[in-house]
């Protein structure tokens, strides 16, 4: 199966290309906007393609059996990119789209959430863009295409700057720890390799023309945020684990966060690399307290995912993180951010 992977230079995209290359039934081609973001380390083929250029994308999709949309970035890249992809796939007669969405499409809802739960764009620009993107994929299906939408929770594992590297640095510097009621929300963590499993199973899932299905992705044994923070802190030797009150957390996020973010942008603009503390986005404070639990039973049943045990995932994260200098500068531009 000849498959184009859009966003192949990102965290999930790179891991997916490696997993696909190890199979005999799929021929993966990575799609990237720039030559610098190509994938020489994977040994796989790649092409240059602008996902916001309808004509170029339609040309690129000719002859492909499926396309996997792992594109991250700003709201336009997510929403408009999905609209362009839907039209390009129709024009190129590419029959199937595997679209990577997010649990953020469910908004601030709490409790057990299934794929039939209502979408709510109320969590900010990211949730709105992802809801819009899903609507564009649905339009592709209405025109006769086949689509599988995957809605992962927080994708982590070795190499995850967002949910491992950054969290580890906060723990080591005492800015994060046991958050009390502020960290009692379910983490909905899912190993990046399990997301890749789901994508490859979705490529082979029997579907008819004009059929759309969606799957939540979260490990059944994913813990509450407090448990994850304490487990990671102990494994890294960031002890004693501090109890962080809501006032301290909010001061860090709302007072220190904006100037830190501005400094990051300034350094990027002038092309300089400088180790700065990671700002804590306000959206994460909401997420850590949100009692949302993804029901991933349909993914287990229909995609046959063999979920990576939490302990195994944790060990691989610690092994990766322990080999890094916590003062290194880090590039978060290529990871999928759920807030």
Language-model regions: role of each:
Residues 3-23:
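N-terminal Rossmann NAD(P)H-binding glycine-rich loop of SDR-like oxidoreductase domains
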Residues 67-100:
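NAD(P)-cofactor binding segment of oxidoreductase domains
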Residues 161-166, 182-204, 212-213:
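Substrate-positioning beta->alpha
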Residues 205-279, 296, 335-339:
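Mid/C-terminal beta-alpha module of Rossmann-like enzyme folds, strongest
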Residues 289, 294-304, 308-339:
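Amphipathic terminal alpha-helices
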């Amino acid at each position: 199966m000849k498959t184009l992977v859009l966003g192949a230079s990102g965290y999930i995209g790179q891991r997916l290309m490696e997993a696909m290359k190890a199979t005999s039934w799929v021929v993966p081609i990575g799609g990237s906007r720039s030559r610098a973001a190509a994938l020489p380390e994977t040994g796989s083929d790649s092409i240059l393609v602008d996902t916001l250029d309808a004509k170029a994308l339609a040309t690129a999709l000719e002859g492909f059996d499926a396309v996997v949309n792992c594109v991250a970035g700003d709201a336009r890249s997510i929403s408009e990119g999905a609209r362009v992809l839907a039209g390009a796939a129709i024009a190129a007669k590419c029959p199937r789209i595997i679209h990577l969405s997010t649990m953020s499409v469910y908004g601030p809802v709490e409790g057990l959430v299934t794929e039939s739960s209502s979408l709510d764009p109320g969590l900010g620009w990211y949730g709105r863009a992802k809801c819009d993107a899903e609507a564009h994929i649905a339009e592709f299906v209405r025109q006769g295409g086949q689509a599988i939408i995957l809605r992962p929770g927080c994708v982590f594992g070795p190499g995850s700057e967002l949910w491992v590297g950054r969290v580890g640095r906060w723990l080591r510097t005492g800015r994060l720890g046991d958050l009390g009621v502020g960290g009692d929300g379910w983490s909905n963590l899912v190993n990046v390799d399990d997301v890749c499993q789901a994508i490859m199973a979705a490529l082979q899932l029997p579907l008819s023309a004009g059929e759309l299905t969606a799957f939540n992705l979260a490990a059944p044994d994913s813990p509450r945020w407090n448990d994850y923070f304490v487990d990671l802190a102990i494994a890294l030797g960031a002890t004693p684990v501090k109890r962080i009150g809501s006032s301290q957390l909010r001061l860090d996020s709302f007072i220190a966060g904006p100037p830190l973010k501005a400094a990051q942008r300034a350094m990027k603009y002038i092309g300089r690399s400088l180790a700065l503390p990671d700002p804590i986005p306000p959206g994460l404070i909401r997420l850590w307290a949100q009692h949302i639990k993804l029901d991933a039973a349909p993914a287990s049943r229909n995609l046959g995912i063999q979920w990576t045990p939490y302990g195994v995932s944790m060990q691989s994260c610690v092994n990766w993180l322990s080999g890094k200098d916590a003062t290194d500068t880090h590039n978060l531009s290529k990871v999928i951010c759920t807030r």
